[in-house]
Amino acid sequence: MLGKKISLSIKKAFGITMSLAIGLSAMTAPVLADNEAKLKLPVGKVKRTAAPVYDCSPDLLLIMPNAQADNDEVSDLLKEAKGELVGTMGEGRLKCLIYKTEKGHMADTEKKFMKDKEHFKYISRNYRFRAQVVPNDPRFTSEWHLGAINAPKAWDTTMGNHTKVAIFDTGCQASISDLAGKTMKGYDATTVGARLTVLGGPGPIGDLLGGLGGALSEGAQKDVQGHGTLVATTAAATANNKIDTAGVAPGARVYPVQIAGENGMTDDIAIMAGLLNMMASGNKIVNISYAAPPPVGFTNALLHAPLHVYMQTFHDLEGGLIFLSSGNDGMFDPCPPTHYVNVVSAIGPDLKLTDFSNWGLPVTFTAPGKGIVCTARDGKIKSVDGTSFSSPIVASIAALVWNANPGLPNVAVESILKASCFKAGSAPWTPYYGFGMPDAAKAVKMAKFGM
């Protein structure tokens, strides 16, 4: 019954009409709480789209069988297709088969299995994604983003001490000053040993296997590419340590989850494995600064159906929050929104949508994403651009909110973030900024003293 509800919810998301979203997307906005700036609607923004580019693992399918399907019949169908079952993730509602098709026959096999509704519930390819960072010049701006979201005023109440933020990325360089002493062992979803976690879903068996997988994992305290440390220090760099940076939640702990290697690429399987580790380890806040050009990105619940089952389970049943960068293609995303993923676009110091930020129907929030000062894995200060950095800013505001009131359910944290937002008009939502840019100080006050 539970799996049926999740299935219906995903299907309902596709019934949301374009006209409803556009009807909510006009107008102009209230003044920011502690300054006189406003979010500005972009002028002449065109819904730029392009032909989808499907980058995926060759000859690999992710298959979620129907709960009522006979296991022997499913096994026979897989054998008849002349492929190989190379792995299984999760159990029960999260059971997902990793299937290697006959070489060159992925599309045919996918089409055949998708027609068989009796045995197969969801099928997708294992898509690959890149980190969402934009090259920037070496000129450093001030940490304007902290003032824009009223972080310093929020710190009068809480700095997020000990609240955990999971950074799904290339690992985090725990040895640098800004992350030393606060970066947990974490989890490496890219190794065979660590992927023991994928053998079990939530529950006693999943917890046991998750603990075993975590113990065998070497963790993710080394950044193999560099992107993860930039994201982690944006979120939670230590303050008052004689380094010229501070994270949005400087007291928070970082739980690194390595989902990408030296090439900076990740895929559905790695993220699903990471989410299973979240369920086993009790982590509640996840940031994923990866995307692909619309409509192929993570926001597409149809293309990434198994992954979306995992994300919705983490949100609805485990009480977690997921923050996802909208992407850096400067394109319109037509994918309908989902209640279990918070998609974040990027604005610049002019409080206007950046040229590179994707925007569209799935956007939930916006945050600064241009000229963000953070720390690289070599300990040097960098100024960076990208929705890779707007997403962890909102995730870290959520950490401040949860630290101010640990008893809040995840949906209450989301409601507070939305209610606190600086907007770009009287409309409650726009396709550029979603519900707006969360005000950290206002959100923390709401969490502490009520709406």
Q: PLM features: residue spans?
A:
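Substrate-binding/access-modulating region of protease and related hydrolase catalytic domains
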Residues: 160-161, 238-242, 256-340, 350-353, ...
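C-terminal segment of classical bacterial N-terminal signal peptides
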Residues: 23-31
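Short, small-residue alpha-helix embedded
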Residues: 389-406
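Primarily auto-inhibitory N-terminal propeptides
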Residues: 32-136
